[in-house]
Amino acid sequence: MKHIRNFSIIAHIDHGKSTLSDRLIQVCGGLSDREMAEQVLDSMELERERGITIKAQSVTLDYKAQDGETYQLNFIDTPGHVDFSYEVSRSLAACEGALLVVDAGQGVEAQTLANCYTAIEMDLEVVPILNKIDLPAAEPERVAEEIEDIVGIDAIDAVRCSAKTGLGVDDVLEKIVSAIPAPEGDPEAPLQALIIDSWFDNYLGVVSLVRIKHGKLKKNDKIKVMSTGQVWGVDRLGIFTPKQIDTTELNTGEVGWVVCGIKDILGAPVGDTLTLAKNGAEKALPGFKKVKPQVYAGLFPVSSDDYEAFRDALGKLSLNDASLFYEPENSAALGFGFRCGFLGMLHMEIIQERLEREYDLDLITTAPTVVYEVLTTSKQTIYVDSPAKLPAVNDVAEIREPIARCNILVPADYLGNVITLCIEKRGTQVDMVYHGNQVALTYDIPMAEVVLDFFDRLKSTSRGYASLDYGFQRFEESNMVRVDVLLNGDKVDALAIITHKDQSQTRGRQLVEKMKEFIPRQMFDIAIQAAIGNHIIARSTVKQLRKNVLAKCYGGDVSRKKKLLKKQKEGKKRMKQIGNVELPQEAFLAILHVGKD
């Protein structure tokens, strides 16, 4: 047991986590050279395409150290993006140490900081590593000082390596063995295993990634899931060397996968504890804190026949992604679908793409909203996650919107631009500290503004140098209104948005103009209106297509022309009474982009 090392790799986006993990696998011979690919651990097609890590993955490697001993290294690759920070906290719960990878050219960024603090709170040993020293722009000395300055951990003798060229990777492995403590646990105690992750395999059912804290787990053991009390037999278990390898048992301190033939998706919730059915452990392990979704959007299948398939797909995805929340919803315009909760806009895009790719569905998304706290006139507090659920204007005493505490790290040159952006997003400054050339800004900004496009705008105003980390802070009273969209006088529930009173005029106008571009012309006029309550704030009209009925009159009497035009007008009027408007998918997407340009 003293030869086991469990660790994960934390870093900001694009600082080279996945490449470093490739090198570690290669040096320890986990895969032959033929099977080696770039970013082995980013196994999802989508991850490879976007070049980001979404799911935490685990690998078990054997490393023969310089002291002649062979160590078993279990490591978990984690995502770096702020939307997936919950994946990081889950991975850290299974480890004793973490490698803090910092790009020697870019220096410390906000996410590095956030994940690092999470690790320190969990009492992990944090080992700083300076990556990308092969780049001409690398300044390892400056960055090492920056790490000490901002993060506050000792970084003078930090390992320097280049994951791309393989330089210094051996030093990294030696450092892991020397600096990270061995797991503590009692092999004789009753089994306690923490479920770090689970996913659905079409042949095996639910596969769970577990970390054995105490005791050991053997094939054919009867185990109990502590939250549900269900008992299962262990069919197969093993480790990843990125490939799934079967073994006969998992010992204390190890990380591996278990298949118990669980068919039900809710059978093995993430963060749960497994124990033996006979003389098992009394109490469960402390799991991770449940994450609250920050952004909600309606997802609807384009054809209503897909509803069942859509429901199953969501179930399977939510098993793999503990932070996805969903409940059934129906809309007059779009039929039956689900209201889903996400951690941020990137998370929402990823989930939608995974549903469309992996499960072959066509989906329409409505505009994303955050959760508002509403105090009604009858002194009730309700939480509203969709514009349709907002009570009527005269029943609302006050609407409180969620405020996010944003920590931004930005080079001093771009400070002005970033502050201007924060003010435009209705932010209030909390704190500002200079660390050498970097400035740490703390702002309170409404969540609705942050999740919409704050990240993209921040990157573009600072030429990509600023970095952001945010978390929910509190609810605060604010003057919010619901803007409804009417087509020919009928409300379209799926198009409503909640926005701040000051911006409602411009938002409404933009919305209407955008919709006008995307609705195809019909045989009659379509009036698109934006309204707050009964007050119309903007309107535009999609003009009708009409036949030239006067083409066959050469010269002739004016009353003849009038008659023909009047006849046409009456026909159009009749048409308009029974006609309904088809809304293309683009019209819904247009709403997502309102206020971005």
From Swiss-Prot:
Predominant location category: membrane
Role according to the record: Required for accurate and efficient protein synthesis under certain stress conditions. May act as a fidelity factor of the translation reaction, by catalyzing a one-codon backward translocation of tRNAs on improperly translocated ribosomes. Back-translocation proceeds from a post-translocation (POST) complex to a pre-translocation (PRE) complex, thus giving elongation factor G a second chance to translocate the tRNAs correctly. Binds to ribosomes in a GTP-dependent manner.
Domain tr-type G per the UniProt entry, residue ranges: 2-184
Membrane disposition: Peripheral membrane protein
Coiled coil regions, renumbered to chain: none
Protein name stated in the entry: Elongation factor 4
Protein's GO biological process: positive regulation of translation
Positions of disulphide bridges: none
KW GTP-binding (keyword) present: yes
Protein EC: 3.6.5.n1
GO cellular component, one term: plasma membrane
The protein's enzyme class: hydrolase
Binding site for GTP: D14, H15, G16, K17, S18, T19, N131, K132, I133, D134
Origin superkingdom: Bacteria
Record's catalysed reaction(s): GTP + H2O = GDP + phosphate + H(+)
Record keywords: Cell inner membrane, Cell membrane, GTP-binding, Hydrolase, Membrane, Nucleotide-binding, Protein biosynthesis
Organism: Vibrio vulnificus (strain YJ016)
Molecular functions per Gene Ontology: GTP binding; GTPase activity; guanosine tetraphosphate binding; ribosome binding; translation elongation factor activity
Compartment(s) where it occurs, according to its Swiss-Prot or TrEMBL record: Cell inner membrane
